[in-house]
């Protein structure tokens, strides 16, 4: 609820970052990150969006929505083998990571381990080559399917209609993926 968040932030916005789930897989609930993230950024709050189940299945404009960190996975709407993660990082998020006062406790949780890897020709662990080939094919499929988002929406609507037609109730009335 964007209005409720705005009312809350007017009273208390003394925190560094907020984590949001773009689309919750079990419920199908879709949070409007296009409104929530700019509101948080208005108060100087970094945004971390979990879009594992929505990335490439819902419209996403990372810069326009002012998202600092966007995380996705290969196994959902991308339709690639599981095992790969995607992270987009804003300049504000990089600045915050580089200015940490305490080190990241785990090598694998430290995104800065990947900083400059392409230029250095160094990857911080074993390269998942077969997964990358699968991802390349999945991205080719996405590129060659310009109506993908509309198709996802149409299928989702049909499934919800069938659920209601069968006499079941939807978990929520609106705001679903």
Predicted regions and their residues:
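Short, structured coil segments at secondary-structure junctions
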Residues: 43, 65-66, 166
